[in-house]
Amino acid sequence: MTPDPASALQHRKRRHIDVCLTDPVDYQTLTTGFERYQLPYNALTQTDLHSVDLGTEFMGSRLRAPVLIGAMTGGAALSGIINRNLAEAAQQLGVGMMLGSQRVMIDDAVAAESFDVRGVAPDVLVIGNIGLAQLQPSMVPALAAALDRVGANGLAVHTNPLQEAMQHNGDTDFSGSMSRLREVVDSLGYPVMLKEVGHGIGASAAAQLVDCPVAAVDVAGAGGTSWARIEQFVRYGEVRYPALAEWGIPTAQALTEVRGILPDVPLVASGGIRTGMDAAKALAMGAEVVAIARPLLAPAVESVGAVVDWLQRFIDELLVCLHGSGAANLSALRERGVTELP
């Protein structure tokens, strides 16, 4: 018997989790590019470490640190545990959270429970999620209802042509997607962010967004997790197309290119952000916030405490980076910038 589409989608979501927990899904040769930059160290800093302020505003919400838990999962039974552990950790630390794709909850009401996080995270910035390939203006009522259902503050639309091409029966028709995105941005009634999934938004894509009033862009560059690798593991049990698994725009390059073309649009830096130093460099290069996903997956399967511990170490390192560079807050950090190594 052929499984119904909703069941097949839930099964694929679970396979994504399993592959990310067990297989080598990071880029193997391509890096984020942040290693080519140095955060200037100031031996005569005039800051008090305990007074450094990491607070910021993003998509209408106040964050205690410029950190989002990146989009990961939804739909599978384990997804609900993961999302609630992530959300409770976000509540404790005052950071934001992106949900995994809500397409599954639009297709299957039962799957909606895996996205319910407001019970443990009443104050957290929660950003919903849908794929650009599936986005249609006719979906706006259902999409708005899905966002209402989870108490989201906004929506992230993920664009992922390479991932979809690697996926069995992926949605590979992106023709007309920009006009559909504009229609949804104009009519949804929620702030809309555009994001990649880890292969990068660069100059050519940013130029297409100049006249599209998105609330933010997550450059989601290459150098961290490769969804082209994940989908090949899911589909073939191996990486059959290694060149495609290594294709993307490094995060540092993506951030620089998009900031140059969209100087006034808030940017999220994600894709291989693994340390507080990575975050400090990204913020100094113009990102408003950073997002972290796969490093938090195993902790989220374990417990809320494991997620809090991981994020607290990350935030503590970021705090020391500001202090050591002589920056009392994020604005001062951006004024200092970074130095490109020879």
Swiss-Prot record:
Gene3D superfamilies: Aldolase class I. One of its GO terms (biological process) is isoprenoid biosynthetic process. GO terms for molecular function: FMN binding; isopentenyl-diphosphate delta-isomerase activity; magnesium ion binding; NADPH binding; oxidoreductase activity. SUPFAM superfamilies: FMN-linked oxidoreductases. It is found in: Cytoplasm. Substrate binds at residues 12-13, 101-103, 163. GO terms for cellular component: cytoplasm. Its main location: cytoplasm. Its cofactor is FMN; NADPH; Mg(2+). Signal peptide: none annotated. Involved in the biosynthesis of isoprenoids. Catalyzes the 1,3-allylic rearrangement of the homoallylic substrate isopentenyl (IPP) to its allylic isomer, dimethylallyl diphosphate (DMAPP). Belongs to the IPP isomerase type 2 family. This is Isopentenyl-diphosphate delta-isomerase. The lineage of its organism: Bacteria, Bacillati, Actinomycetota, Actinomycetes, Mycobacteriales.
